[in-house]
Design a protein with these regions (language model features):
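Short, intrinsically disordered, low-complexity terminal segments
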Residues: 7-8, 16, 36
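Carbohydrate-active catalytic/glycan-binding domains of CAZyme proteins
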Residues: 27-496
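Alpha-helical transmembrane segments and their juxtamembrane interfaces
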Residues: 18-19, 300
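General helical structural elements
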Residues: 12-13, 31
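Bacterial N-terminal signal peptides that target proteins for export
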Residues: 2-12
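N-terminal amphipathic alpha-helix initiation
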Residues: 13-14, 69
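N-terminal leader/targeting signatures
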Residues: 10-12, 18, 42
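C-terminal motif of bacterial Sec signal peptides marking the signal peptidase cleavage site
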Residues: 21-24
Length: 496
């Protein structure tokens, strides 16, 4: 099958997965709230155990004010004032929901309240462009990106269509994160023709220390693109410019090893580098996140092995992927992330996750993100739950653990081919007080808080960040670790 036909199948299938979204919408008043916490602190009058993996009881549209962390896909989160605001794709479990970009907010990253929608209908400029090109716009907006420039709030959105690659990325602005939002214009478009270009969806933006701005976008057809913006308007610096490709992935027998999309870009001042997070594979099953980094926003972005992200290979590290701890069905479809800061400078990683018992549910997962000493990001194996940042003592580490090495199997293709989520399953290991490791891994361990070093018998080393955490599978406090081994494979663990 020609490669472009594979891409078209991917686009059509993606539309089908999100086809639960339909017409009309309006701004609603925020849900009442008596929350008073902040990230890193506990709150009152809320039972964290009430957060379920599936949510049939609140799925009906009439209960949208109770959705909280449910029905979330492709979130973009930023802290504005007292609240973290989350803007996300128009989706709903088993129902028809209104389009317009869903808005939620939280004071503590655990309790979320549904606020409303950005738009009361499909943005006129984007819908008109698609209609002018002979298409019919989807009744859904996808993958927003939110930011603040000066006193202006900017929200980039994607509007696509059943016509392959006929899509737009538009910009709306507001004086408040609650809106009202007004269209400013189209930033970049893509069409169903014979040109070489990626699909104009999945925007993300970085502002350099000098004030320059760049938009990164794309899905399938031709990888991830970068486009220079005019910081004064948020639109393309050169009208009609599509930008250039900056990241790609591998092929097998002329077929992509899976989708590449859902980029997130940040600048990390402590390391002076730009980090590009990219979603690989099918969104309902094998979805996982890769990271590359660069000294300049225009690249080249390099992977763990120093290979240019624009090379036709699959890049590492893969910092999160479908996984399963003991006593739980597992989580899959866990990528297209947002990376953001709290007021104390701590980083967080958030995305949707789908419970493997029924992957049609879509839950918001927020996790702490940590930095290795050599500048690579790693994420917690468990969701954030108000845990503090106190150092864990060496005596606390001895005992029984579950360990997951995030390995990967290539399955070229999209939804039809990538049916198996390839859950990475935990294995038991024991850290003995005498410094030995036994179980699924044999070797020795040493600890200098917060770093746990494991030397594997037969070769290989692991450097792991140790942190307090919550065992969500067993609903109790625990200790977690996350890090990379010497080959760039992510390694997770939690104490039993």
């Amino acid at each position: 099958m020609p490669l472009i036909d594979i891409y078209r199948r991917a686009a059509i299938l993606f539309v089908f997965v999100l086809a639960l979204v339909f017409t009309g919408c309006e701004k609603h008043s925020p849900a009442s709230s008596d929350k008073s916490g902040a990230a890193g602190t506990t709150t009152t009058q809320f039972d964290i155990n009430s957060i379920a993996d599936t949510y049939d009881s609140v799925a009906p549209f009439a209960d949208y004010l109770r959705w909280g962390p449910y029905n979330v896909h492709d979130p973009s989160i930023k802290k504005f004032g007292d609240y973290y605001y989350c803007y996300s794709t128009d989706v709903g479990y088993g129902i028809t929901v209104r389009p317009g970009i869903q808005i939620r907010r939280s004071k503590d990253l655990v309790q979320w309240e549904f606020v409303g929608w950005v738009f009361s209908s499909l943005p006129a400029a984007g819908a008109a462009y698609i209609q002018q090109k002979g298409g019919a716009p989807n009744n859904a907006l996808w993958a927003p990106y939110v930011m603040k420039t000066g006193s202006e709030y900017r929200l980039y959105y994607a509007l696509s269509s059943p016509t392959p690659r006929l899509s737009v990325i538009g910009l709306a602005t507001a004086a408040s994160p609650d809106g009202p939002w007004a269209e400013r214009g189209l930033v970049v478009t893509s069409t169903n023709d014979n040109t070489t270009q990626t699909n104009a969806i999945d925007p993300t933006v970085v502002t350099t220390p000098a004030g320059d701005q760049y938009l990164y976008y794309g899905s399938a057809w031709d990888g991830i693109y970068i486009l220079r913006l005019d910081p004064s308007t948020g639109l393309a610096a050169v009208a009609g410019d599509k930008g250039k490709r900056i990241a790609n992935r591998g092929f097998t027998n002329g077929v992509y090893n899976g989708n590449i999309e859902g980029a997130e870009i940040i600048y990390q001042p402590a390391f002076g580098k730009y980090y590009l997070f990219i979603a690989y594979d099918w969104l309902q099953t094998k979805y996982n996140t890769r990271v590359c980094r660069a000294d300049q926003p225009t690249g080249p972005f390099l992977d763990f092995n120093g290979v240019d992200a624009d090379s036709n290979i699959d890049h590492i590290p893969m910092i999160i992927a479908p996984y399963q701890f003991m006593g739980h069905g597992g989580w899959q479809g866990i990528s297209h992330c947002t990376v953001f800061l709290d007021d104390s400078g701590h980083y967080y990683y958030a995305s949707q996750a789908r419970p493997s018992v029924n992957s049609n549910f879509m839950d918001l997962h927020v996790r702490k993100l940590f930095w290795m000493t050599d500048g690579w990001p790693v994420v917690s194996p468990e969701r954030y739950a108000w845990e503090g940042n106190n150092l864990v003592t060496q005596d606390s580490l001895a005992g029984s653990w579950e360990r997951i090495a995030l390995n990967y199997t290539v399955v070229p293709g999209y939804a039809a081919e990538q049916v198996n989520p390839d859950l990475q399953v935990s294995q038991p290991v024991t850290l003995a007080a005498n410094g030995t490791v036994s179980g699924a891994v044999q070797g020795t361990w040493t600890y200098s808080a917060p770093w746990l070093q494991v030397v594997r018998a037969g070769g290989g080393t692991e450097k792991l960040f140790v942190q307090q955490g919550r065992d969500w599978e067993n609903k109790k406090p625990t200790i977690i670790f996350t890090g990379l081994d010497n080959t760039g494979t992510a390694v997770w663990g939690k104490k039993q």
